[in-house]
């Protein structure tokens, strides 16, 4: 009987339960993640250029895109989001080379994965960070990403503003 119980417990429930639990979660995260990123997000980079050649951060990164991302990450606590930004803020204050800043940005990914694993953040957060990391090529991009994150954090901290 013990062998049958072990075989049944190991074989049937694990095989049947794992797909039943994981499949909807994985399918939901995989299917919904690309849909949730705003259309055209990062397609033209962080910056626009004036007629005279001056580069400036596109306003949607601190406006429309930041507000949209904050509403999609609304289930996340603002303190958890701010903990992701902590190392980025430290690297901004110091005179560091670009590589050190890029490392600080890259450190957000494992922290985001941990938050998603603990169900404290949606899977969209990981996709969002990966997409942004792929577009950071220099200090200007890093600072644009940082400003974008701070705007998202601001909207997350004030949910009443988003709903109005």
Q: Language-model segments: what does each one mean?
A:
Residues 1-164:
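Small/polar/charged residue-enriched interaction surfaces, especially the RNA/DNA-contacting tracks
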């Amino acid at each position: 009987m013990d062998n049958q119980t072990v075989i049944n417990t190991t074989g049937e429930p694990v095989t049947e339960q794992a797909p039943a639990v994981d499949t909807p979660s994985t399918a939901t995260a995989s299917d919904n993640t690309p849909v949730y990123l705003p259309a055209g997000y990062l397609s033209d980079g962080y910056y626009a250029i004036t007629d005279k050649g001056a580069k400036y951060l596109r306003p949607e990164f601190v406006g429309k895109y930041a507000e949209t991302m904050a509403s999609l990450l609304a289930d996340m606590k603002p303190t958890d989001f701010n903990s992701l930004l902590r190392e980025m803020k430290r690297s901004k204050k110091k005179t560091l080379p670009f590589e050190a800043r890029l490392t600080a940005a890259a450190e957000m990914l494992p922290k985001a994965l941990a938050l998603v694993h603990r169900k404290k953040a949606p899977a969209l957060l990981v996709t969002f960070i990966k997409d942004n990391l792929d577009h950071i090529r220099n200090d200007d991009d890093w600072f644009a990403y940082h400003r974008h994150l701070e705007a998202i954090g601001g909207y997350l901290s004030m949910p009443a503003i988003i709903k109005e």
